[in-house]
UniProtKB/Swiss-Prot annotation:
Residues 136-159, 166-183 have a biased composition (Basic and acidic residues). Residues 536-555 have a biased composition (Acidic residues). GO terms for cellular component: myosin complex. InterPro entries: Myosin_tail. Keywords: Coiled coil, Phosphoprotein. Pfam families: Myosin_tail_1 (PF01576). It comes from Bos taurus. Residues 72-161, 268-401, 432-522 form a coiled coil. The keyword Phosphoprotein applies. The modification Phosphoserine is found at residues 12, 26, 28, 542. Residues 1-68, 136-202, 214-254, 478-555 are annotated as: Disordered. This is Coiled-coil domain-containing protein 102A.
Amino acid sequence: MSHGPSPRLAESPQLSKGSLLTILGSPSPERMGPADSLPPTPPSGTPSPGPPPALPLPPTPALLADGDWESREELRLRELEEARARAAQMEKTMRWWSDCTANWREKWSKVRAERNRAREEVRQLRQRLDALTKELAGARRERQEAQGESEARGRELARLRGARGGVDRTPDGPETEPEREQEPVPVRDVGSGCERPQGSQELELMESLLKNRPEEPEGCWEVRSAGAGAPRGSSGRQERGRLPWEDTTVEEDASKLTALRLRLDESQKVLLKEREDKMALSRNIEKLEGELSQWKIKYEELSKTKQEMLKQLSILKEAHQDELGRMSEDLEDELGARSSMDRKMAELRGEMERLQAENAAEWGRRERLETEKLGLERENKKLRAQVGDLEEALARRRRQTASALDCDLRASQAALFEKNKELADLKHVHGKLKKQFQEKVAELAHANRRVEQHEAEVKKLRLRVEELKKELAQAEDELDEAHNQARKLQRSLDEQTEQSENLQVQLEHVQSRLRRQQQNAPLFGKIRSARFGAEEAGDGASDLDEDEDLQIQVA
């Protein structure tokens, strides 16, 4: 999902001072006194109980402290800018990843639409297969009828063999009339069933290929939870920031300085750890991009193989149709041969009936035509020979037709065996491809789970950044108050220094006036000297009192 830039980042151009105060752990402005602006005394010494010296304070350490403060502030500003740039880069990366996910989902929706279309085609092919199966069943029934008719012809030939025995008895012509009236039933194309199992198996293969295409994988990534020490450190800093600051001695100031340094080191460690986590996230994203490109290549290869398989299926269908045409032509030839054989059989039947009629007439005239008996026996022998010849010819025709049918059946069985072997090879290859595809789908789901976990971590980091921004804003306010109080103290210090300089000038003026009076009045003696001595003693005591008051105020 895409995320815009954080409003806190856009509204925080003054976070440099706050970040410096947060890292250094500066005290609150209301508790900052004059001792905070002065260099700390060693913790081993004890503060002097007497008044401070009357001379003005040297400004050199304060200037040095201000320069160090500015350099640190610039350093923290640079670090903050780097952190902002990295956060912006992280947000851009997440937006790019969300766009990639949307594109991937669109591709999967297209694949689903193709799969639905393929299923519709498979349904239509199944309907056609059912219709062809019905036609095949009808052809098989017709074939069985043709076989029954051929068996009836065999029975008729058996009756012809027994024709000799029928000469001695009265023939019954009408018994054979129903058999003569039987007409040959035309045989339809029965070879279409030879290739039917092959076509159905190919259709089932295509259906399984389309059904096994998986839906859109959904999941989330699994990665390690980084930055566990950062929340603990931040909570510790918040608790220490909430502690009330009280007026402390110089020793406590030194201990606070060491604590501030420790906190600074801890914050630097946290920043380094967060930086390492961001680098690890960027490496994981690059790795996922590579895997995504590989998946795209594999998907294109699978689509190409699918198109090739469809082409092969169309080629097999065309070959099947050609083979069906050839078999139908063979069946038509066979039907023509059978019709010619039926005509010959009809002629033989007519001749046999004529012979039977002649034999019947001669049987009636046997008593009167004993002389013609031998001739009739010879004719009978000739007829038997003809019947034997006809039987042999019929047997030869049967063997020829049976051998032709056996050859065609063997050829169709061999072709079917080859097609089954090719289908088994294709199924084996399909099983391997299916297994590889399932493995890749599992890897993709794992990668999606890792991406979602990364998104959760990014949300946590953003929440942490917002908390830090709030702390920075509070520290910035405290720093502004501290600067205001420092300016007030500086103004009061300047006023005290001006007062001390004025007092010093007055003291020098009084001393010069006393020296002039001593030089210009040597004649007055001890009285005037005693008088002026008492006044000078009073003035010196007052000056000392004023100096002590000034030093107390400065302290």
